[in-house]
C-alpha cells in the first residue's frame, strides 16, 4: 500500500468522522460505506466541498436478492448422479432488507485520487435516495439509468424517466427477479402495420456453467 493512498484515506476519514461511515483500503482502492441512506447527499456534498471531488464518474447499484444462492444442484447427490442441468429459479419480487446497494465513483483531480462510496438500502419498503444531480450534473443520466435498471427512486431528481428501455416497458431488467428472457417480445405485424408486443414463449434456462473454486 502506498503511503500517499494511506494519507488520502486518513484525511478523508477525518472529514467524515462525524458520520456513520466505515472505510477501508483494498486492492489499492479506497472505499467508504455509509450506514444510513439518508446521509448520502450530505456526505457526498461534504466530500465535494472539502476534498475537491469535482467529478462523479459513475452511479450504479447491485441487487443482492439471490446472493449466495446457486441454480445448480450440488451436494451428496452429485457424486451419485453427476451435476444436474442448471434451472432458472423463479424468484418472487421480495421486500428484502439490504437487498440493494448504491455505489458512487468519485474523482478528485486536484488531489489525484479516486474513491468509491456505497450504501446499502436497509429498509426494503423505502427504495429511495436523494439525488445528487444538484452536486454533479452528470448524475442526471446515471441516476436515470439506475432507476430504469433497478427501480431505485431518486428524490428531487429533475427528470426521473427511463433512459434505456422504452416508455411502456414493465419491470427493471437488472433486478435478480427479472427473467432473463423478459416478459414480452416484439415483432412487426404486417396486417396491423405496426409493432406488436406478445408474451415470451421461451423457457428460462441457465447457460452459465457451474464454476468450482478451491
From Swiss-Prot:
Top EC class of this enzyme: translocase
SUPFAM superfamilies cross-referenced by the UniProt entry: Nqo5-like
Alphabetical list of PROSITE patterns matching this protein: COMPLEX1_30K
Enzyme Commission number, as recorded: 7.1.1.-
Pfam families: Complex1_30kDa (PF00329)
GO molecular function per UniProt: NADH dehydrogenase (ubiquinone) activity; NADH:ubiquinone reductase (non-electrogenic) activity; quinone binding
GO cellular component: plasma membrane
Annotated keywords: Cell inner membrane, Cell membrane, Membrane, NAD, Quinone, Translocase, Transport, Ubiquinone
Taxonomy, superkingdom: Bacteria
Topology class, membrane: Peripheral membrane protein
Known catalytic reactions: a quinone + NADH + 5 H(+)(in) = a quinol + NAD(+) + 4 H(+)(out)
Keyword Cell inner membrane found: yes
Compartments reported by the entry: Cell inner membrane
Family per record: Belongs to the complex I 30 kDa subunit family.
HAMAP family, per the entry: NDH1_NuoC (MF_01357)
PANTHER family membership: NADH DEHYDROGENASE [UBIQUINONE] IRON-SULFUR PROTEIN 3, MITOCHONDRIAL, NADH DEHYDROGENASE UBIQUINONE IRON-SULFUR PROTEIN 3
Assembly and binders: NDH-1 is composed of 14 different subunits. Subunits NuoB, C, D, E, F, and G constitute the peripheral sector of the complex.
Protein name in UniProt: NADH-quinone oxidoreductase subunit C
Organism: Francisella tularensis subsp. tularensis (strain WY96-3418)
Amino acid at each position: 500500500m502506498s503511503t500517499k493512498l494511506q494519507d488520502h484515506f486518513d484525511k478523508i476519514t477525518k472529514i467524515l468522522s462525524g458520520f456513520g461511515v466505515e472505510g477501508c483500503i483494498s486492492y489499492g482502492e479506497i472505499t467508504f460505506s455509509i450506514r444510513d441512506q439518508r446521509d448520502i447527499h450530505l456526505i457526498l456534498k461534504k466530500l465535494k466541498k472539502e476534498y475537491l471531488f469535482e467529478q462523479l464518474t459513475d452511479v450504479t447499484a447491485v441487487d443482492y436478492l439471490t446472493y449466495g444462492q446457486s441454480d445448480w444442484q450440488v451436494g451428496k447427490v452429485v457424486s451419485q448422479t453427476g451435476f444436474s442441468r442448471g434451472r432458472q429459479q423463479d424468484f418472487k419480487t421480495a421486500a428484502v432488507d439490504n437487498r440493494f446497494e448504491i455505489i458512487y465513483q468519485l474523482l478528485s483531480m486536484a488531489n489525484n485520487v479516486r474513491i468509491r462510496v456505497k450504501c446499502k438500502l436497509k429498509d426494503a419498503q423505502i427504495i429511495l435516495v436523494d439525488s445528487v444531480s444538484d452536486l454533479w450534473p452528470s448524475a442526471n443520466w446515471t441516476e436515470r439509468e439506475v432507476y430504469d435498471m433497478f427501480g431505485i427512486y431518486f428524490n428531487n431528481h429533475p427528470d426521473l424517466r427511463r433512459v434505456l428501455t422504452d416508455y411502456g416497458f414493465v419491470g427493471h431488467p437488472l433486478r435478480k427477479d427479472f427473467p432473463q428472457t423478459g416478459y414480452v417480445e416484439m415483432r412487426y405485424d404486417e396486417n396491423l402495420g405496426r409493432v406488436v408486443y406478445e408474451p415470451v414463449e421461451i423457457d428460462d434456462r441457465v447457460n452459465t456453467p457451474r464454476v468450482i473454486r478451491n
